[in-house]
Amino acid sequence: MSTPHISAEKGDFAKTVLMPGDPLRAKFIADTFLKDVRQVTGVRGMLGFTGTYEGRPISVMGSGMGMPSIGIYSYELFKFFDVDNIIRIGSAGSYTEKAKLFDTVLATGAVSESNYARVQSGFEGDITQPSQSLNDKLRASAAKQGIPLIEGNIHSSDVFYRQPSDAKPTYWEKLRDERGCLCVEMESFALFANAQVLGKNAACLLTISDSFVSPEITTAEQRQKSFTDMMKVALGAEY
């Protein structure tokens, strides 16, 4: 049964879905790492693929940018396509010298000023949690492959372009600092909220693509094709 946003049938998706923001990164992962790949959806250019990795079925699908977008796609995957696990694999901007360009971050919580969870389910908190069992599997995969992980809270922002404010610190800066956020992205708070509401599992691996404490940045092509450590960690976990 297809949904308004996913043109697939039940059984087209594996129980575990890797979810980058960029649909072209989803295609790159499918083409580079998976065998017996088939495209299962492409509504609005949001590509999704199912194949196998080391003999295990796995799917990969783009989420788009921001919480409303990943909120729709992840909810439909969990609710209507019997997906049990979604691992976001995305890029992030570092808030600290501890997380340098191309480092891999494993989120232990997603902090946000967003009202996504309050509007959706009445949840009033400012932090949503990943699945601890999924995080344990990702840690084991990283250790097996010798890929270091930096762990901690991340900031899920609703806004990419913020206007200057006379208030110092601003609400989001205070929230970021109080929660000790390592980096900023725009999706995981909603993904974790969906998983909690629906009794499913979600996790988030991020590659540092730019920094608020360093002038270094990555190119669009690097973000699409070069963030392979987090891909290998997510693919290598035993779900």
Briefly describe each language-model feature range.
Residues 23, 93, 155-161, 190, ...:
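Glycine-rich beta-alpha junction loops
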Residues 95-97, 113-115, 158-165, 213:
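Short acidic/glycine-rich loop or secondary-structure boundary segments that cap or lie
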Residues 166, 170-203, 209:
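A C-terminal functional module that forms or caps the active site or interfaces directly
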